[in-house]
Every structure is written in C-alpha cells, then in structure tokens.
Amino acid sequence: MDATELKLVLDDHVLWLSNVGGKRADLREADLRGVNLGGADLRRADLRRADLGGADLDFSCLPLWCGGLNFKIDEKIAKQLMYHVLNLMIYSEIEIPTTPQTLVEFANRIHRSDVEMLSLKGV
C-alpha cells in the first residue's frame, strides 16, 4: 500500500468514525513498516497481521478490540505501549506482576471470553 492509498483509507476511516460516510479502515496484513501514523485515529481499524515495525504512532489512537490484536510492532513501539500501561497501573495503584508468567496470567484475566488466552509457549 503506497502513501496515497493509505491516506485515502485513513481519510475514509475518519469519515466512517464520524458517521458521515467513508468506511472502516481494513489494514489487515498491510506493510506499514516505517510509516508515519502520528496522529492517526485507528480506533476500530482492522490491523490484524499488519506489520507496524518502525512506524511512528505518536499521538495516534490504537484500537482496543480484536482488530487491534496480532499485528507486528518493533521494540520502540513495545516500550512506548508498556510505558503507558505501567504509568496507568502505577497511577491507579494496581499491583504490577513481576514475572513474565504472572504478567501473562494477569492479562488472561481479561473481561472478554471471546479472545485467545496468551501463552509464553515458544518464547
């Protein structure tokens, strides 16, 4: 997907989010490595199996639904996401799991029953 096509998809997505036409962004399996998505509103966009390695996600909005699972990120994005999660947990006085296993167990207590449980198998 080139920059022009991506801009059209994101512009249509904003219209769709505002209920004034457009359509939901379908970015499944998209190669978005190194793309500047800063400020992009990706709520409810489908990012499954997309590759966002090296993408700039500053001031963007990632979806918190199943379409926002199973896409690739790089270490920079992982650190940024982890920073935000830990900041909110500390601020909210939520106990932070201290081992990878207890972290997975904590995450698997998600309020949804229709998502696949996480596992450290193969890590």
Q: Model segments located where?
A:
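Intrinsic low-complexity/IDR segments
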Residues: M1-R33, G38, R43-R44, R48-V123
